[in-house]
């Protein structure tokens, strides 16, 4: 269903939100950057409030968007969802029909929320949600019309929670995956596997998942033969993991 057919969720922006946004904006080097940081902070705060209503724990102060140094260096509007990963909350101004995605927000995100602003800054509307992007071939923007209903964000969080919980088990597949991605963010790996599950046919899982794992575990020197063997092993592991996760997600559906 198109989001235009659904009533949008309105989130009030109280004085506290504006005070926090002003503090971040005040230390920026230009007026333009200060305005950008101000709107980003309000967008993030609105999504934080929405998730708080749903009793989903977030770490507002631990998010880059509420860090004075990081907001000075990058156009970020992230909200850390505790134990899950970072959600990007992009402001949408009146008349805009697309959400531009700065390069710095393509990777390490579990998804994107469009936050509609009006000329008054006393409230915003949550336009909808877009799940994890393919970081190897990312779009530069997301059309507002292509956003999913905001409820799908909760479904996404639940899936990622279930997948991360599986990776903590003693299942042989989980143990092997932990070994392979020891230095990588489990949240990011799980989000990419969820994307593959959602967008690829079953017969594509092996190769798409293997390629993703290969990129996450790249390093060292290989002969062609050893590299081919390693790729096959990673494809086997990716296929096994996706089959496990598919079983968990389908059972919960």
Q: Model segments located where?
A:
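Nucleic-acid endonuclease domains
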Residues: 1-83, 90-253
């Amino acid at each position: 269903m198109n989001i235009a057919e659904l009533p949008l969720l309105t989130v009030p922006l109280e004085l506290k939100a504006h005070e926090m946004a002003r503090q971040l904006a005040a230390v920026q080097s230009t007026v333009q950057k200060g305005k950008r940081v101000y709107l980003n902070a309000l967008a993030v705060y609105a999504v934080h409030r929405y998730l708080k209503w749903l009793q989903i724990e977030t770490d507002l102060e631990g998010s880059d968007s509420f860090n004075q140094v990081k907001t000075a260096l990058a156009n970020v509007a992230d909200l850390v969802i505790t134990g899950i990963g970072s959600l990007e909350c992009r402001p949408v101004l009146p008349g805009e029909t697309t959400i531009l995605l700065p390069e710095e927000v393509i990777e390490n995100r579990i998804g994107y929320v469009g936050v509609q602003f009006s000329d008054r800054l006393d409230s915003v509307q949550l336009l909808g949600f877009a799940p994890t992007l393919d970081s190897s071939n990312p779009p530069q923007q997301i059309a507002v019309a292509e956003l999913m209903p905001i409820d799908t964000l909760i479904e996404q969080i639940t899936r990622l929670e279930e997948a991360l919980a599986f990776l903590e088990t003693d299942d042989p597949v989980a143990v092997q995956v932990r070994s392979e991605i020891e230095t990588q963010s489990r949240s990011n790996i799980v989000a990419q596997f969820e994307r593959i599950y959602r967008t690829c046919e079953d017969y594509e899982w092996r190769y798409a998942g293997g390629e993703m794992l290969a990129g996450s575990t790249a390093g060292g020197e290989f002969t062609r033969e050893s590299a081919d063997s390693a790729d096959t092993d990673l494809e086997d592991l990716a296929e096994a993991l996706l089959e496990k996760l598919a079983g968990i997600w389908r059972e919960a559906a």
